[in-house]
Amino acid sequence: MAVQQNKKSPSKRGMHRAHDFLTAPVIAIEPSTGEAHRRHHISPNGFYRGRKVVKGKDE
């Protein structure tokens, strides 16, 4: 069974956990449609940076 060799102090434990928090995804607004989407991803209706890049089923 694994046993720690030295106890980790509360300060060191906190430093180890410093980057474990969750960050919210960055949301951008499509300028042509005003729709929200994740940065560097196409919007749900197929626009990216003001241009239509993906055709829909009805197009």
Swiss-Prot record:
Pfam families: Ribosomal_L32p. One of its GO terms (cellular component) is large ribosomal subunit. SUPFAM superfamilies: Zn-binding ribosomal proteins (SSF57829). Transmembrane segments: none annotated. One of its GO terms (biological process) is translation. The keyword Ribosomal protein applies. InterPro entries: Ribosomal_bL32, Ribosomal_bL32_bact, Ribosomal_zn-bd. Keywords: Ribonucleoprotein, Ribosomal protein. Residues 1-59 are annotated as: Disordered. It comes from the Bacteria. Belongs to the bacterial ribosomal protein bL32 family. This is Large ribosomal subunit protein bL32. It comes from Laribacter hongkongensis (strain HLHK9).
